[in-house]
Amino acid sequence: MHPRRPEGFDGLGYRGGVRDDPAFGGPFHARSFGSGTELGHWVTTPPDIPGSRNLHWGEKSPSYGVPSAPPTLEGPAEEPFPGGGDGPRPGRSSEQLNRFAGFGIGLASLFTENVLAHPCIVLRRQCQVNYHARHYHLTPFSVINIMYSFNKTQGPRALWKGMGSTFIVQGVTLGAEGIISEFTPLPREVSQKWNPKQIGEHLLLKCLTYMVAMPFYSASLIETVQSEIIRDNTGILECVKEGIGRVIGLGVPHSKRLLPLFSLIFPTVLHGVLHYIISSIIQKIVLLILKRKTCSSHLAESTSPMQNMLDAYFPELIANFAASLCSDVILYPLETVLHRLHIQGTRTIIDNTDLGYEVLPINTQYEGMRDCVNTIKQEEGVFGFYKGFGAVIIQYTLHATILQITKIIYSTLLQNSI
């Protein structure tokens, strides 16, 4: 379980550009976790719009209370305005264009990850929990066909159900992590000069966060796989209500096959932590490769300002894309097991992913994670762990296409402005 947003940004940090008021934040001091040096940004948790502030390679967000130094500019030095006025500065319009362009690029990426990809997530989860299915939908062609059938028989809402609850789960996860880190010495970030103790404390924070968000994740999963045919018009906060009811034992009655929350802790935390570790490692590797490639190309030949701006925005987006793709593919079998354990005993009715119409009940009787793995292997084969994998292919193909289109549009705007 994890936030759909890959965690690699600086949250409220600010990169590039000069603060108009260098004294801002003076009375506040950054928290330190055993070191007075500035923490390097290996991984960060708060979500941010990628590309909106990382204007140049190697720059970091200034710490609170430390005035940011003006960036080094190529070409002749600009004379400051007399009296420190806020009059128009040379190159200010270009700088604002870069910021708004970066904001737009990041917004397009977030929109693709959380909105356009949601139908793929819905169908992927329905296929994962459907142990009745004879068609595994391992290719995107069969997935597109079943999507069309659902849309024809139930309307567009069949593919967009539960989207609000996914945002709630992300908010609960980030909020829980922030609160726990504020009241405990567990760090939200890991410095470049890390040590095993710091890594362990950071991963412990992640484990506690996933445990807190687990009941809400379970409620969100039910909303995304519940058939629209028998679905009631529930409010957007129904996920919160069901999550709290799952903890205190109230709410909609469940069957005796419902697994207790403590038996779901291990698979949920295992999936979340592994997803986080794999994403972080892949992201750092891809960023390092792209950075070296960019530096070597800059040394080999002089690059245009347009290329410099593209190199400032897109490597981080590409790294996040690759990290999310690799972690989803590697952990797909574990995610299938996790979703079946969460959905068991909740009396959920799902759509028939073989026919595109009719509904099916979920009547599994897994005793735990090991029993679920063995049962899937015996009754459905190895490919039973990959049911609905074609939806992942569609999801990331769509994401890559949106990134490429955004890059083309941004390059065109830069060519017209230079």
Swiss-Prot record:
Any GO BP: establishment of localization in cell
Region of interest called Disordered, as start-end residue ranges on this chain: 46-96
Membrane topology: Multi-pass membrane protein
Compartments it resides in: Mitochondrion outer membrane
UniProt entry keywords in alphabetical sequence: Membrane, Mitochondrion, Mitochondrion outer membrane, Phosphoprotein, Repeat, Transmembrane, Transmembrane helix, Transport
Broad class of the protein's primary localization: mitochondrion
Solcar repeat positions: 96-187, 311-416
Record-listed Phosphothreonine modification sites: 45
Task performed by this protein: Transmembrane protein of the mitochondrial outer membrane that controls mitochondrial organization. May regulate the assembly of the MICOS (mitochondrial contact site and cristae organizing system) complex which is essential to the biogenesis and dynamics of mitochondrial cristae, the inwards folds of the inner mitochondrial membrane. Through its interaction with the EMC (endoplasmic reticulum membrane protein complex), could regulate mitochondrial lipid homeostasis and thereby mitochondrial fission.
Subunit structure: Associates with the mitochondrial contact site and cristae organizing system (MICOS) complex. May associate with the endoplasmic reticulum membrane protein complex (EMC).
Lineage: superkingdom: Eukaryota
Keyword 4Fe-4S: no
Expression sites by tissue: Widely expressed. Highly expressed in hindbrain, spinal cord and brain coronal sections containing corpus callosum, fornix, optic chiasm, thalamus, hypothalamus, midbrain, pons and cerebellum.
Gene: Slc25a46
Protein name (database record): Mitochondrial outer membrane protein SLC25A46
GO cellular component: mitochondrial outer membrane; mitochondrion
Keyword Transmembrane helix applies: yes
Positions of modified residues (Phosphoserine): 32, 35
Organism: Rattus norvegicus (Rat)
Any one GO molecular-function label of the UniProt entry: protein-containing complex binding
